[in-house]
C-alpha cells in the first residue's frame, strides 16, 4: 500500500480531550456505572433499543442527550436531505492508499458533525466471496489484510473527528439472498483467517467504537444470539468494550439476544422491550445485571467521545463540505482501474462520442449505501469540460425517442393511452372496482391510496395498451415499482420483479417489426408501505446513431449496474443485462474504437463482449465527482493507478465458491456450506490452477517501462 500514516501524529490533530482512537478508559467505565446506578429498570430497558429509526432516546435528568445514528459507508444519508456521495468501498480499496483512506474517514466524520450525527454506520468489511452479493460495492474486496488495513484507516479518520464508527456486519454476511434465513456454515480456521481479521484489527488497532451484528445465522445460530461470536470472541478474546448493536430488524428473540451480548436493538425494541424483558427478569432467564452491562457499554462509549459533555453538531462545518468534495475526487482518481487498452487507444485522441445508459448520471449501489449528493459530475459532463468541441453527445436522451404517446388503449386505435383496471386486492382477482383511461403509467402514491375509496395497502392495478411501429426497430422498455410489477408483450412475460420489496426497476430491449401490433400488459400490486409504479418506452433512432458515429474517432460507452440492479436486500447476476451486452457489440460493429466505462460493485462476465471493446475502464461506483476523475483518466490528464482488490473469474463456474453459494433453497434455515474453506478469491485460484480473467491486484497505467544498454561487470570470483 502507499504511504503509511503516522497514527500518533494524526491523533494529536484530533479534538484535544480525546485520546488516540478514543480508548474507553477506567474513568469512562466508572462514570457510566454511576449513571446506570441512578436509572430505573424501565429506563434501562428502554435505553437498549432505538428511540426512532436512527436515534437513541435522551434522558435529560441524567444528562444523557439524544444520540443520532446515520447510514452509511459512502456518505451520511440521514438527518439531512443531501450529503457528500463518496466512491464505493470497493473503489476506495482499489486505491491501496492509507493516507487517502484516512482522509475518507475524516470527510465522513466532518459530514456527520455538520449534521449532529454521533454514530456513523460504517464501514462494511464483509469479504468478497462471490460477485453476486448485492452489497459487494460497500465492502473492500477479497483479501483479509487489505480489507483490514482499509477499514483501520477509515475508522481512525472517522473517530479522529469525534464520531463513532461502526464496523459491520459481524459476521460472514457474504450474500444478500435470504439474509434473514441463511446460515453461513464455516469452520473456525476459516473464520479466524478470512472473515474475522478485519473486525479484529478494527477492535484492537483502531479501537472502533461500535460493532454491528449481521442478519444471517452463523453455523445455525443467528448472529444476534451467538454467545461464542459476541461474548467469547468479540468481548473476551479481542477485548471489545464498545457498543454491539443489531442490524436493522436483525433481532429474532428477546432472551436469546439479551443473553448473547447484544447491547442495542435497532431500529426499535421489537424484542428487547419492557413487554418481553420484565417477565424474563422476573423469571430469572435474564438478569438485571445483564441489562446494566448493556447500558454501561453504550454510555461508556459515548463518554469516551465526550458526547455527554458537548454539542455534537458543528455549525462551522458546511454540509456541502469542500474537504469532502475534494476527498471524493481524489478517491475516484486513484481507485478507477484500467483493465484493457488495446493498441493504446487511451488516452483518447481526436473527436469522441460519449453514450450509454450511465453517461449522463453517476450510478451508485442501492440500499443503505445510497446517498443523494448536492451535485454530481457525470462522465458526459466531465468529458465536455475537457474535450470541449471535440465531443459529440450520443447519450440516451439524444438517440432514443419517447413513444408512450403513441400507445392506444386497444387495437382499434381510437383512443390514446392505457386502459387501467383497479382492484381492491393484491391479486388482480374478481372484477375491477374502477376502469378508466390514463395517458401514462407513472405513479408515486407514497403511503396513500391510489383512488378515493381504495385502501392505502393491498391493492393491485392492470394497464393494457397497443403499439404499432411504422418501421422495424428496437425499443428500450423501463419498468420499476414498489412492490410487485411485471411486463407482458403479446402475452409473453418480458421482465419484472413480482414480490414484496422496496423500489426496484428492470430495463430490457425489444426488437419490433414495422406494421405489427404489440399488446402491452403491465401488472402491479402494493403490499404495505409506499406504492410506486413507473413504465417508459423508447425507440432507438438508429439513423441518428449511425450518423453520429461516422463523425468521431472513438466512442466512450458508459454502462453497467445501478442502484436498482445492485444493492442491499438482493443479489445480482454475474453478467450485464443482455441488452447492454448486445448494444456494446452493436456499437463495435459500427465503429472500431470502443471504450467501455463499466459501473459495478464487483466482477462481471466479460466473455460475451470483451472482444468488442478495445479499452475497458472499471469505474466501480465512483461517487459524485466520478465523472471528472474518469474524464481526466480517459483524456490522459492523469494516469490510471487503481488495482483490483478482487479476482474476476472468466465464468461464474470458475469461482472457488461455485456450488456452495446457494444451497437448500426450500429449507426454513438455508445452510450455505463454505466448503472452500480458506481458499476464497486468489487463494482458490492458486489451489485450483484455474486462471482468472483478471487477477487480484491487476491494473494498467499509461506509463511504460524499458531497460536499455544493460551490462554486467565481473567484480570477483563469485
Feature locations, PLM:
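Bacterial Sec-dependent N-terminal signal peptides
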Residues: 1-26
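Glycoside hydrolase catalytic-domain context in secreted enzymes
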Residues: 20-475, 480-493, 498-718
Amino acid at each position: 500500500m502507499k504511504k503509511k500514516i503516522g497514527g500518533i501524529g494524526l491523533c494529536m490533530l484530533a479534538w484535544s480531550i480525546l485520546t488516540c482512537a478514543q480508548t474507553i478508559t477506567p474513568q469512562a467505565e466508572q462514570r457510566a456505572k454511576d449513571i446506570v446506578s441512578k436509572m430505573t429498570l424501565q429506563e434501562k430497558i428502554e435505553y437498549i433499543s432505538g428511540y426512532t429509526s436512527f436515534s437513541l432516546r435522551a434522558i435529560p435528568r441524567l444528562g444523557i442527550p439524544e444520540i443520532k445514528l446515520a447510514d452509511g459507508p459512502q456518505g451520511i444519508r440521514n438527518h439531512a436531505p443531501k450529503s457528500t456521495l463518496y466512491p464505493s468501498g470497493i473503489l476506495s480499496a482499489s486505491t491501496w492508499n492509507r493516507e487517502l483512506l484516512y482522509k475518507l474517514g475524516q470527510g465522513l466524520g466532518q459530514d456527520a458533525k455538520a449534521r449532529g450525527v454521533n454514530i456513523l454506520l460504517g464501514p462494511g468489511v464483509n469479504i468478497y466471496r462471490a460477485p453476486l452479493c448485492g452489497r459487494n460495492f460497500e465492502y473492500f474486496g477479497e483479501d483479509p489484510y487489505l480489507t483490514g488495513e482499509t477499514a483501520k484507516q477509515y475508522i481512525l479518520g472517522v473517530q479522529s473527528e469525534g464520531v463513532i464508527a461502526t464496523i459491520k456486519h459481524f459476521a460472514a454476511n457474504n450474500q444478500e439472498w435470504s439474509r434473514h434465513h441463511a446460515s453461513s456454515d464455516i469452520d473456525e480456521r476459516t473464520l479466524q483467517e478470512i472473515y474475522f481479521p478485519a473486525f479484529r484489527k478494527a477492535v484492537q488497532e483502531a479501537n472502533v467504537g461500535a460493532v454491528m451484528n449481521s442478519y444471517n445465522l452463523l453455523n445455525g445460530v443467528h448472529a444476534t444470539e451467538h454467545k461464542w461470536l459476541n461474548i467469547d470472541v468479540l468481548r473476551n478474546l479481542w477485548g471489545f468494550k464498545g457498543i454491539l448493536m443489531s442490524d436493522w430488524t436483525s433481532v429474532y428473540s428477546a432472551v436469546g439476544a439479551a443473553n448473547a451480548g447484544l447491547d442495542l436493538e435497532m431500529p426499535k425494541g421489537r424484542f428487547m422491550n419492557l413487554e418481553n424483558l420484565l417477565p424474563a427478569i422476573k423469571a430469572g432467564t435474564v438478569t438485571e445485571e445483564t441489562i446494566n452491562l448493556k447500558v454501561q457499554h453504550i454510555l461508556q462509549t459515548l463518554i469516551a467521545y465526550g458526547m455527554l459533555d458537548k454539542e455534537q453538531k458543528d455549525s462551522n462545518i458546511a454540509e456541502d463540505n469542500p474537504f469532502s468534495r475534494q476527498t471524493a475526487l481524489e478517491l475516484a482518481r486513484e481507485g478507477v482501474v484500467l483493465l484493457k487498452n488495446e493498441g493504446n487507444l487511451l488516452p483518447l485522441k481526436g473527436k469522441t462520442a460519449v453514450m450509454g445508459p450511465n453517461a449522463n448520471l453517476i450510478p451508485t449501489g442501492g440500499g443503505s449505501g445510497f446517498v443523494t449528493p448536492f451535485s454530481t459530475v457525470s462522465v458526459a459532463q466531465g468529458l465536455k469540460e475537457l474535450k470541449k468541441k471535440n465531443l459529440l453527445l450520443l447519450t440516451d436522451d439524444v438517440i432514443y425517442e419517447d413513444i408512450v404517446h403513441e400507445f392506444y388503449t386497444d387495437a382499434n386505435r381510437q383512443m390514446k393511452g392505457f386502459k387501467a383496471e383497479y382492484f381492491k386486492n393484491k391479486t388482480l382477482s374478481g372484477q375491477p372496482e374502477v376502469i378508466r383511461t390514463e395517458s401514462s403509467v407513472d405513479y408515486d402514491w407514497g403511503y396513500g391510496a391510489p383512488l378515493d375509496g381504495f385502501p392505502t395497502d393491498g391493492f393491485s392495478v392492470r394497464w393494457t395498451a397497443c403499439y404499432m411501429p411504422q418501421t422495424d426497430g428496437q425499443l428500450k422498455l423501463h419498468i420499476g415499482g414498489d412492490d410487485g410489477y411485471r411486463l407482458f408483450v403479446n402475452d409473453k412475460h418480458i421482465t419484472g420483479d413480482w414480490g414484496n420489496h422496496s423500489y426496484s426497476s428492470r430495463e430490457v430491449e425489444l426488437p419490433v417489426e414495422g406494421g405489427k401490433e404489440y399488446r402491452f400488459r403491465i401488472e402491479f400490486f402494493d403490499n404495505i408501505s409506499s406504492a410506486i409504479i413507473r413504465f417508459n418506452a423508447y425507440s432507438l433512432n438508429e439513423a441518428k446513431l449511425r450518423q453520429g458515429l461516422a463523425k468521431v474517432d472513438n466512442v466512450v460507452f458508459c454502462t453497467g449496474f445501478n442502484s436498482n440492479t445492485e444493492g442491499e436486500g438482493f443479489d445480482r447476476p454475474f453478467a450485464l443485462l443482455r441488452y447492454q451486452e448486445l448494444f456494446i457489440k452493436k456499437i463495435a460493429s459500427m465503429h472500431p474504437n470502443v471504450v467501455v466505462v463499466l459501473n459495478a460493485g464487483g466482477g462481471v462476465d466479460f466473455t460475451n463482449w470483451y472482444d468488442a471493446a478495445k479499452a475497458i475502464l472499471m469505474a466501480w461506483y465512483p461517487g459524485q465527482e466520478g465523472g471528472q476523475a474518469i474524464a481526466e483518466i480517459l483524456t490522459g490528464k492523469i494516469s490510471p493507478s487503481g488495482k483490483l482488490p478482487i479476482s474476476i473469474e472468466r465464468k461464474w463456474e470458475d469461482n472457488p465458491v461455485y456450488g456452495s453459494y446457494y444451497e437448500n433453497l426450500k429449507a426454513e434455515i438455508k445452510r450455505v456450506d463454505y466448503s472452500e474453506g480458506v481458499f476464497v478469491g486468489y487463494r482458490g485460484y492458486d489451489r485450483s490452477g484455474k486462471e482468472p480473467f483478471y487477477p487480484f491486484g491487476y491494473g494498467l497505467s499509461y506509463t511504460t517501462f524499458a531497460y536499455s544498454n544493460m551490462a554486467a561487470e565481473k567484480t570477483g570470483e563469485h
